[in-house]
Regions:
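ABC-type ATPase nucleotide-binding domains, specifically the catalytic core motifs of the NBD
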Residues: 12, 92-112, 120-125, 216, ...
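Conserved ABC ATPase signature
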Residues: 131-135
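ABC ATPase NBD Q-loop/coupling interface
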Residues: 57-73, 219
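Catalytic Walker B motif of ABC-type/P-loop ATPase nucleotide-binding domains
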Residues: 156-160
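ABC ATPase C-loop
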Residues: 148-149
Length: 250
């Protein structure tokens, strides 16, 4: 579905993504993990068309996102940015409708998408008339995901979706992402909280200083000493705090 090959991106004279290649197949959740400053957000923004790469190719559903049809192709993907892009003085419902408006959906598709999002996140339905500014941090993050889903994407890119959330709320959000995936949406998950994120991924990649340094299945990465030491050892409090005990590495 998504194929990134030899991607290079710079900010001025500073190279921040260096020859990165990875793929997300139809129906997969793929985790791209790494520390702050590794280049994860830059990769997400480049795929979404917000940054121009220096080199490399990005193909979505077999077509180049640098080609003449890239605007149409990008309607099939949505991104939940690290910084929430919601309007605090608009209602929850209006924020959701904004996600559909950007992708120019017809009324029937908007109604269907609204129903699906409110079933996935009941709190958004219950608070649809409330201002977004009155929501808790966890609810605002669910609103950001719901807004992205209003586009009814084939691929959902989530950049640090658990940022600022408690372990319990992060686990709840990832459980929702699993459900979204079961309903046919592929997910590219960019995260630091590997102890909670890795269990829902089929495969993963480790990125450091702009390069992919390790890749493998969930089980392979969960057993790798480098991942255990660098990405699992420091966040075991998250694992212990998960309310349902589901945050385990297979």
């Amino acid at each position: 579905m998504l194929e990134v090959a030899d991607l290079e991106v710079s900010y001025g004279a500073v190279k921040v993504v260096r020859g990165v290649s990875f793929r997300v197949a139809e129906g997969e959740i793929v985790l791209l993990m790494g520390p702050n400053g590794a280049g994860k957000s830059t990769i997400a923004m480049t795929i979404a068309g917000l940054l121009r790469p220096d080199a490399g190719t990005i193909r979505f559903r077999g077509e180049s996102l640098a080609g003449p049809a890239h605007h149409v192709l990008r309607r099939g993907l949505s991104m939940v940015a690290e910084v929430r892009r919601i309007c605090p003085l608009q209602t929850v419902e209006d924020n959701l409708l904004l996600g559909a408006f950007i992708h120019r959906h017809d009324r029937r598709r908007v109604v269907d998408a609204m129903t699906e999002v409110q079933e996935l996140f009941p709190v958004l339905g219950a608070k649809r008339r409330a201002l977004a500014s009155t929501l808790s941090g966890g609810e605002q993050q669910m609103l950001a995901v719901g807004q992205a889903l209003m586009a009814r994407p084939r691929l959902l890119i989530c950049d640090e979706p658990s940022l600022g959330l408690s372990p319990r709320l992060a686990q709840e959000l990832f459980t929702r992402l699993e459900r979204i995936n079961r309903e046919g949406v592929s997910v590219l998950l960019l995260e630091q909280r590997v102890s909670i994120a890795l269990p829902i991924a089929r495969r993963g990649y480790v990125i450091e200083t702009g390069r992919i340094v390790l890749e493998g299945t969930r089980s392979e990465l969960g057993r790798d000493p480098r991942v255990i030491e660098s990405y699992l050892g420091g966040v075991r409090e998250d694992v212990r705090a998960a309310s349902d005990g589901a945050a385990r590495v297979a």
